[in-house]
């Protein structure tokens, strides 16, 4: 069984990932949704030829790490290995105006608070605030938060959570920079490969590394329909819209090992990269955060330990318009 706080750094061949590509999103990127099947097949064959030409030249990369975790309100509390400081996990991103490792105030957290499940020994931890729906997905349903799918610290038993990132060699795009058509083809294929890498990694995590679903036997189509146990919400997607959360992911994973660098807004370079969390709870499900109000914005900024106006920039598209 994969050990908690162990990292898995993976490199994949392009041919390993082709079965995991979700071509529906590729067609959507090309404006072919609803178009004749022949049009889709034509561009797919061009894409497969390009992928074949990459086989011996390029790869994709992934990092997965399993942590002990507990929820505290709408926050996730990640317990860090004792060697974190030497490994650079406790570095902050203050140069970007974001401080990630925190006991709530932007400083590395250590605690012996027995009442919330953090043991008497001084353990390092990282507080990872989540956002909660202010309007349910459907009438009668609860307002969801990803922290709902993690065992509360107050129960005295720790849960587990996975953290991951994937990327595609960024040099691919440069090769086609002088041809608009093939540049777009390379970019859309790279985006699909980053997602396909996450799909394949998630399968390996469920069945082997984390191993909470060792007997899973799903087709690729079933995986694309998300019929597996658990979820892998990605940063920047509907339930995790705050791209500055990538600074927290970086502190947990050291994303440069997968060739990923962050801009000052938390966007990943190369563009064809994915990062996020993996939950194993059988009832965990994907949801859209929707719009949040000024009250939650201010509370979230406080929990992140950053100025409200800075956080407003990251969550602009998720705010209720006045």
What are these language model-derived features?
Residues 115-116, 141-322:
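C-terminal accessory domains/tails appended to large, multi-domain proteins
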